[in-house]
Amino acid sequence: MKQRQFFGTDGIRGKVGAGKMTPELALKLGWAAGRVLSRSGTQKVIIGKDTRISGYLFESALEAGLSAAGLDVMLIGPMPTPAVAYLTRTFRAEAGIVISASHNPYYDNGIKFFANDGSKLDDEVELEIEAELEKPLTCVESHLLGKVNRIDDAAGRYIEYCKSHFPAEQTLSGLKIVVDCAHGATYHIAPSVFRELGAEVIAIGDKPNGLNINDKVGATSMGQICETVLAENADLGIALDGDGDRIMMVNRHGRVIDGDEILYILACDAQKRGVLRGGVVGTLMSNLGLDLALQALEIPFVRSKVGDRYVMELLKEHDWRIGGENSGHILNLDHGTTGDGIVAGILVLAAMQRQNASLEALTANITMLPQVLVNVRFEGDNDPLASEVVLAAQAEVEQKLGARGRVLLRKSGTEPLLRVMVEGDEQEAVTEYANYIADAVRNLV
């Protein structure tokens, strides 16, 4: 298959006003996508965005391009990425478009597409859109231009969808939860969801101003929520990222519960209820502790490349339901078509209620091994992964670690860096081993 030149593994992303993320390219992209999507289906597209100030700019540009190609547009304003996937399905739209750079700072933005079933757009369709980008922009006849409408009740629809994943006979009454919305797309959704299910909610990161998304808050900056959980004597914390597709949690003692531990909780709960349907998909970066804990329960575990797109590929290949990344992208195909931080949090809370157990109790039988990541710059044409010296250092460390450790060497896709990751039982030894391999890379001539 021809390689995509424009789309990455998760759409298009970059600094606003530079590279691909310009108004001109957004206009052309809307038109090109409209040309491809108008060949079949309902002739309508949903557009949602996060809270970045540049969202208005790209929303207008995409809207104009789609209209010029003859497609109707439905705007839903600031909404989580998984909400766009859900509403695309329920409105029988031909596609959904998300304007977001996820966990990146406000000065970045991105554009990604969902197919009509709420899944990521196929590579073949993205290649068709790229082919249209090479053509001069035209406009359909005036009577064929697309119309634009706003879905005023989009937030309410999605709130009810999220709540539907919590058992009707259960309530969160008596729980105090800190919810961190990262000043992002969940700011008007997540607090309402958990309050309406009965919890006492303390919301932080819920006052977006266009410039503060992911700024010292959210799933990639856990300091504030950990402090708030302790200060408020809360039962737990739920931290979402800027577009709401990833989650991290905090137990009552202020300890972070990452994506690997959330996967463990969901897999254990599904196994207890007899609905697991296979095993769990993690990634190359998933902690060995998850692998070992699932082995103890005789739950199969496989690793994909890093990225929720690749997790989804393996889930479909194995016909399994649960997978995700340690960064907090959680997929449960019985509860949606894409990563959804709010829904993942609801599923963990449902497991707590069913088992009458705290977050601490649900993670008592998984021990996360110390993990050290060292980024090493290499020079010239030297490929460290082809170096006998580096490979010998890796083999030596792997022999010392045995079955209770792991080494992963990955090259960066954007710069001459080798990422050296080592896991093992002892922090001091793991750090020593990672630096030993890193030194072998640095000494390459």
From Swiss-Prot:
List every position bearing Phosphoserine: S102
The protein's superkingdom reads Bacteria
Record GO terms (molecular function): magnesium ion binding; phosphoglucosamine mutase activity; phosphomannomutase activity
So which cofactors does this thing need?
A: Mg(2+)
Reactions catalysed, as given in the entry: alpha-D-glucosamine 1-phosphate = D-glucosamine 6-phosphate
Cofactor note as given = Binds 1 Mg(2+) ion per subunit.
Q: Which UniProt keywords apply?
A: Isomerase, Magnesium, Metal-binding, Phosphoprotein
- Which residues of this UniProt protein bind Mg(2+)? S102, D241, D243, D245
Q: Which PROSITE patterns match?
A: PGM_PMM
The catalytic activity of this protein is classed by the Enzyme Commission as: 5.4.2.10
Gene Ontology CC, one term: cytosol
Class of this enzyme: isomerase
| Modifications after synthesis and translation | Activated by phosphorylation.
InterPro entries given in the database record: A-D-PHexomutase_a/b/a-I, A-D-PHexomutase_a/b/a-I/II/III, A-D-PHexomutase_a/b/a-II, A-D-PHexomutase_a/b/a-III, A-D-PHexomutase_C, A-D-PHexomutase_C_sf, A-D-PHexomutase_CS, Alpha-D-phosphohexomutase_SF
Family of the protein in this entry: Belongs to the phosphohexose mutase family.
The protein's name in its UniProt record: Phosphoglucosamine mutase
Higher taxonomy: Bacteria, Pseudomonadati, Pseudomonadota, Gammaproteobacteria, Alteromonadales
Question: Which gene does this sequence derive from?
Answer: glmM
